[in-house]
Amino acid sequence: DALSEDVALIVDMFCCLFEVKEAGLRLTRLDSPMCPKFHFDRVPCRLVITYTGRATEWLTNDTIDRTKLGAGSLGQPDHLSGLYDSESAIRRMQPGDVALLKGSGWEGNEATGLIHRSPHVADNERRLLLTLDFI
């Protein structure tokens, strides 16, 4: 079917791009945010594609205060922590977008992994999310 063909193509392209023989694949149906707070991944690079539902949200480096990530938020929600100044700073991917999220595990990128989160999911809304990682 179309989904399995697309997943196979995405995996092939990911492996070719990064010259790896295998990739860790996760295909997940979600009815709540998997990662509701902004964070960065401790991997070299993660491929993310949302097939249905709201897609991943992210922030550019020039709009954030990284000291407010994790414990630095002092338990505050993202919008109150001082991580970013306004809601207009939040960028949103669209369903079907293929994104390569560079993480802190990328050589030379240890302090600047892409800051992102799962979007809020409305009642009765579901997401179908594919992620690929190096293994």
Q: Where in this protein do the model-derived segments appear?
A:
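Intrinsically disordered, low-complexity boundary segments flanking structured domains
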Residues: 11-15, 37, 45, 116-119
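N-terminal start-of-chain detector that recognizes signal peptides
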Residues: 1, 18-23, 71-74, 99-105
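Short, well-ordered alpha-helical segments in soluble proteins
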Residues: 14, 18, 51-54, 103
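Signature of the catalytic double-stranded beta-helix
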Residues: 1-29
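Catalytic core of non-heme Fe(II) oxygenases with the double-stranded beta-helix
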Residues: 32-95
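Catalytic core of Fe(II)/2-oxoglutarate
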Residues: 82-135
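A structural signal for short, well-ordered beta-strand segments and their strand-loop junctions
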Residues: 24-28, 49, 100-101, 129-131
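Generic structural motif
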Residues: 30-32, 53, 104, 135
